[in-house]
Amino acid sequence: MGKRLLSAAILWGLCGSALAATPTSYGWVEKGLIMPTGVAVKMKLDTGALTSSLDARDLRHFKRDGKSWVRFTLQVTDANTDRQVSQTLERPVEHMVTVRGAGGMEQRPTVTMSICLGDKVYEEWFTLRDRSKMIYPVLLGRRLLADLGAVDSSRTF
């Protein structure tokens, strides 16, 4: 219990000190933090996507205590420093989803991750996919947008 409270306090401290107060509406691109790394990235708010998506490289599925897990590398450019950040993360697979796109149908693992927008931390499901050819490493879908508020497509952060 003590470790959990300490972790929450650290995340809140990182979140609150790095970004401005939570707005009442958001632009179609916002700057947010990926936890637990605390790296600031540009996130695309996509009302056309149901589930959020995260750039994940070198996906490796494995079992831990009989449950499905995934190991992946988060490799992004810090939006505040332009520095490349690379970190290997492991998460339990919540479920697999079938995503329909221009290239056809694809199975993707879904994991729980935390992000910070404004001064709030959100825990959300993210599908993992190599987004290295995409402009934005994080896409926020409608499941999360429903908790955020309005998206103003005429502006960015």
Task: Annotate the PLM regions.
Residues M1-A9:
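Bacterial N-terminal signal peptides that target proteins for export
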Residues C15-S17:
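N-terminal signal peptide c-region/cleavage motif recognized by signal peptidases
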Residues L19-F157:
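Pepsin/retropepsin-fold aspartyl endopeptidases
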